[in-house]
């Protein structure tokens, strides 16, 4: 079948590691279009799941949700070729994305969460990932008592294939760091620091925020160690714009210790902030307000996008 060769050619191009996620997304969209034209629902679904990964790197939440809605529609109409279980990991991402879009009312966010909950239960999973997501949201909203309740509920559930131990631990650090429990956070972070548990971004995110909070806690040696680890992990990830959410406090750390390096990162991140979603733009702005407290010079000169 000629169309399969066309798709394979596009997918081969998308494997180029030098491509920006936006370029990969465009190649996947074209491949999906061809699959749809030829009514290859199974292959189109696989590629849409891959597309969601690339869109996630671009913080393209609204588009992610639209793509996943199509996947769910196809699942309902083609349960003979699409397994619901194969969709649930990305569904967790999509539910997370709904929290980040102010235009989506909380009632709808909760409804998506309940639907996700129903689907994971009927596929034999625990509620661990469901409670974990709520713990993250409550921490971000500074509802720390509720966050701790959800953390406790999460830990009481069994670990399964909908869970990521490294990501869970990374997000738990936010609760302990933001409530002033640095020593406990640092102790709990050891599996991430020593790479006993790993994930694509969880270890790096831990280094970034621990550098800032260690410096604030009067522990410069720990802060310097976390900074070194972060710099090593950031090498080669200059295109990972989704890291914006975690870079602001790292910039703040550098403005306390090495302002020139901090502003180098700021130049990169300000460019990213012009293309990201509303939540990340807001949180980066808040972190930069914090960072500016440590810049003593009345004026700095930056190379910014036009």
Region roles according to the model:
Residues 1, 6, 10-18, 300-306:
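Long C-terminal extensions of eukaryotic subunits of large macromolecular complexes
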Residues 1-11, 24, 44-46, 87-92, ...:
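Generic helix N-cap/helix-start motif at coil->alpha-helix transitions
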Residues 8-16, 30-33, 42-60, 86-99, ...:
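Non-membrane alpha-helical segments in proteins
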Residues 54-55, 137, 175, 213, ...:
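TPR/TPR-like alpha-solenoid repeats
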């Amino acid at each position: 079948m000629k169309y399969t060769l066309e798709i394979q050619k596009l997918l081969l191009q998308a494997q180029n590691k030098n491509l920006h996620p936006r370029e990969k997304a465009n190649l996947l969209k074209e491949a999906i279009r061809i699959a749809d034209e030829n009514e290859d629902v199974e292959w189109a679904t696989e590629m849409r799941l891959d597309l969601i990964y690339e869109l996630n790197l671009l913080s393209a939440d609204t588009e992610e949700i639209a793509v996943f809605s199509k996947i769910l529609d196809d699942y309902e109409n083609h349960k003979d070729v699409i397994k619901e279980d194969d969709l649930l990991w990305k569904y967790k991402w999509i539910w997370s994305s709904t929290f980040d879009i102010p235009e989506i009312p909380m009632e709808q966010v909760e409804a998506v969460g309940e639907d996700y909950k129903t689907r994971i239960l009927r596929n034999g999973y625990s509620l661990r990932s469901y409670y974990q997501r709520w713990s993250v949201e409550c921490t971000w909203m500074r509802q720390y008592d509720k966050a701790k309740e959800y953390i406790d509920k999460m830990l009481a559930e069994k670990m399964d294939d909908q869970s990521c131990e490294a990501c869970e631990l990374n997000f738990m650090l936010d609760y302990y760091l933001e409530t002033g429990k640095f020593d406990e956070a640092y102790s709990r972070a050891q599996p991430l620091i020593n790479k006993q548990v790993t994930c694509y971004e969880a270890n790096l995110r831990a280094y970034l925020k621990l550098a800032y909070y260690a410096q604030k806690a009067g522990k410069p040696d720990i802060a310097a160690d976390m900074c070194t680890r972060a710099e090593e992990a950031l090498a080669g990830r200059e295109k990972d714009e989704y890291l914006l959410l975690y870079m602001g406090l790292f910039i703040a750390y550098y403005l306390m210790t090495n302002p020139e390096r901090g502003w180098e990162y700021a130049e990169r991140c300000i460019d990213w902030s012009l293309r990201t979603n509303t939540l990340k733009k807001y949180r980066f702005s808040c972190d930069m307000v914090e960072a500016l407290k440590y810049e003593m010079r009345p004026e700095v000169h930056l190379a910014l996008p036009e």
